[in-house]
From Swiss-Prot:
Reaction catalysis annotation: Hydrolysis of terminal, non-reducing branched (1->3)-alpha-D-galactosidic residues, producing free D-galactose; Hydrolysis of terminal, non-reducing linear (1->3)-alpha-D-galactosidic residues, producing free D-galactose; Hydrolysis of terminal, non-reducing alpha-D-galactose residues in alpha-D-galactosides, including galactose oligosaccharides, galactomannans and galactolipids
EC number of this enzyme: 3.2.1.n1, 3.2.1.n2, 3.2.1.22
Domain of life, source organism: Bacteria
Taxonomic source organism: Bacteroides fragilis (strain YCH46)
Name of the protein: Alpha-1,3-galactosidase B
UniProt-listed Pfam families: Beta-barrel_GLAA-B_I, Beta-barrel_GLAA-B_II
Amino acid sequence: MKTILLFALSLLLSLSVSDVCAQERVYDISQFGLKANSKKNASPVVRKAIAKIKAECRDGEKVILRFPAGRYNFHEAGSTVREYYISNHDQDNPKKVGIALEDMKNLTIDGQGSEFVFYGRMIPVSLLRSENCVLKNFSIDFEQPHIAQVQVVENDPEKGITFEPAPWVDYRISKDSVFEGLGEGWVMRYSWGIAFDGKTKHVVYNTSDIGCPTKGAFEVAPRRICSPKWKDARLVPGTVVAMRGWGRPTPGIFMSHDVNTSLLDVKVHYAEGMGLLAQLCEDITLDGFGVCLKGNNDPRYFTTQADATHFSGCKGKIVSKNGLYEGMMDDAINVHGTYLKVIKRVDDHTLIGRYMHDQSWGFEWGRPGDDVQFVRSETMELIGKQNQITAIRPYDKGEIQGAREFSITFKEAIDPAINEKSGFGIENLTWTPEVLFAGNTIRNNRARGTLFSTPKKTVVEDNLFDHTSGTAILLCGDCNGWFETGACRDVTIRRNRFINALTNMFQFTNAVISIYPEIPNLKDQQKYFHGGKDGGIVIEDNEFDTFDAPILYAKSVDGLIFRNNVIKTNTEFKPFHWNKDRFLLERVTNVKISE
């Protein structure tokens, strides 16, 4: 009897172990014939591996795809080709994707410290319509970035600027004598750039966006170019310039319609767009994520063409912690929704709304059951009551993909004042996230540090903002230009350190912390945009180390507290900002300020 019991127990244990094992499948990319540090094109191999995984794995299984540590090269040839409409990017299609993950569940991509290097014009990684997925332990870079890094070697007021391209920059002087960057399948002409101090990698003081005209350029020696029309006394020899264009076709990582995603120890060293763009996703965690250089000895000065991370129309909770964001050409993080402009009132329950910005359209805006509210664009005041969508369909084409206009029917009657003539926007309140931004370092970047536009709880704590060049923290809201929603109702900014922000001027940069909704007609505004309660925005226990005056600018706020903060003044730069006030407030009520 004892033998039978032992056998039964052994059988039960073996079945349990095999059941657990069956719940997790582990694949190694080397199984598919791709080895680390080989010159083999990884794009078609990874595409086939993902297809095999999808075919073999059962619903509910945990799946791990591992890459043995090393370098993997992804080319356009053999990549996945998709039509993607990506918020705040160029809507040019099709897109070529190196690692396309779609309709996945419980998938982990583990790079084990690998470098994923891309060529041409590609989206390195996409993750769409997926649940419970993890991306971890890899970096993203391009062999030939579309930004051309050059160093000023001579600056003659009469003869112009002479510069040397960085060793990795391939270039040519065109037939019409223009400096052009070259890469696999692309040619770039550069209209403007950002200047970095050659020693500190800070954005050069009081330069902002600089023009870099190279018409008439010629080589004076191998890899040494004189540009007679490029004259700028601020660019002393040794200055490094990141030459760039206006385009932003491809983020490093594109996420859409995902639920519960984690990005752990992932680094983006370059992308011709944002480092990470997530739209219409729920619950995202970034831990140890970086848009950064490859350490202190990296010869590059720049990272991404636009924001480091960007979250458009997401919900749930966005957590971004322990990250490093440096050298990017825009904000470290931007969280917002998108206003649709009312272009037609069909009846008392139906409106036609339109995506207005040329880089934000073509993707889903809302669903039946979503809560919405309406705003008057001129004064950014809410009008009427909150409402609910009962039906929504694309209006200018037959499907959501690529649509710019939507017919939306609401549960309750729409306020009679809302029409297509006076300027009104529709805001989706359901697709708004809670945000925790903590323990991050933001440094040496263009424009601003962080930007938040969400009514849900937002906590910004224990971060280092080091020479962000513009405003360190911006609370915005705009139904006139960018059309990025919305009002902030519950914001805590605490235990952060700010070192010499505002060395340059960019949009909305009125102080180190700038609460700046875009309100064309502020004088006729009766209500307030941000806040709405006592302590709606609290700024406390921070340290400001600054060379200039403006610490806090606020416009149209009800409920603002500034307390227990330390302000130190240094002489590292000459004060130049037009705002000479420590605290400049416009239409702010219910405010308490004490250093």
